[in-house]
């Protein structure tokens, strides 16, 4: 099962429990930090995706699927993602997302639905009654060559969303995160000198003198790059290569 404190965020203190001994160790380690309230979920092996849906009084529209990638266990930090994704059964995912929104009577505005796609189909992780946050709207904007923020504002101004039904992404847009390979104090970051127009955005959150470590949760990440490509694989490879060529120098 998957256990996480109800007062956490950013994938902090998330653990997978496979046995009673795992549970005992977890309770001992979290006891002094948590609020004694936990979310306990079935652990499902599969691929995590995010679906952003716009709903109006007349229809729902799936803007696209964001294919998420995590760092290896025991980390629960996100290594990156790609929007859109063509690696899933889009009609089946769309139908499932719409059924979820119908079940919770969500009928207006943006919603962000996270799922695990397992071998036997998709499983709901959570429903957020808002547009996806963090860097993803920028990522979507580069793929769609339009502002999803503007589209959301127009929805709340009462403008029809019918035109979004035929929205076709111009690019696949991939995010990859820069992280430290070992604990230490950040001295500098050397970014690749020669990049082409496929690199659309680079942002660094950590500064010289900050403590860094290999990623356990999302707050451990140093910065990110967004790259675009004609295919999902191409965009991911460009972003991966940029991260590989970035040097994180520790004191």
Describe the function of each predicted region.
Residues 92-113, 119, 128-184:
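Active-site "cap" helix and flanking loop/linker of ATP-utilizing ligase/carboxylase catalytic domains
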Residues 15, 42, 85, 141, ...:
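Short, well-ordered beta-strand elements within core beta-sheets of diverse protein domains
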Residues 1, 61, 123-126:
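Protein kinase-like catalytic core scaffold
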Residues 7, 14-120:
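Internal nucleotide-binding/catalytic subdomain
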Residues 7-10, 133:
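A short, flexible beta-alpha/helix-coil linker loop
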Residues 5-7, 74-75, 215-220:
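Short, flexible turn/loop "capping" segments at secondary-structure junctions
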Residues 153-251:
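Peripheral (often C-terminal) accessory segments that flank ATP-dependent C-N-forming ligase machineries
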Residues 1-3, 36-40, 162-164, 201-203:
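A short linear hydrophobic-aromatic micro-motif
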């Amino acid at each position: 099962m998957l256990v996480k404190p109800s007062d956490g965020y950013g994938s902090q203190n998330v653990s997978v429990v496979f046995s009673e001994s795992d549970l005992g160790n977890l309770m001992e380690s979290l006891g002094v930090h948590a609020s004694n309230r936990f979310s306990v979920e079935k652990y499902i092996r599969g691929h995590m995706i995010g679906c952003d849906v716009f709903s109006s009084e007349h229809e729902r529209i799936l803007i696209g699927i964001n294919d998420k990638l995590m760092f290896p266990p025991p980390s629960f930090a996100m290594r990156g993602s790609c929007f859109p994704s063509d690696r899933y059964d889009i009609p089946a995912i769309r139908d499932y997302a719409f059924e979820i929104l119908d079940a919770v009577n969500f009928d207006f505005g943006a919603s962000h639905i996270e799922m695990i796609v397992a071998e036997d189909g998709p499983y709901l992780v959570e429903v957020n009654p808002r547009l996806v946050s963090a860097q993803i709207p920028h990522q979507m904007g580069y793929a769609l060559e339009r502002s999803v923020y503007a589209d959301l504002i127009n929805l709340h101004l009462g403008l029809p969303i019918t035109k979004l039904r035929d929205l076709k992404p111009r690019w696949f847009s991939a995010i990859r995160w820069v992280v430290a390979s070992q604990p230490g104090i950040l001295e500098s970051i050397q970014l690749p000198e020669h990049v082409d127009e496929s690199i659309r955005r680079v942002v660094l959150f950590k500064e010289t003198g900050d403590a860094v470590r290999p990623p356990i949760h999302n707050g451990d990440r140093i910065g990110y790059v967004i790259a675009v490509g004609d295919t999902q694989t191409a965009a991911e490879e460009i972003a991966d290569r940029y991260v590989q060529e970035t040097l994180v120098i520790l004191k």
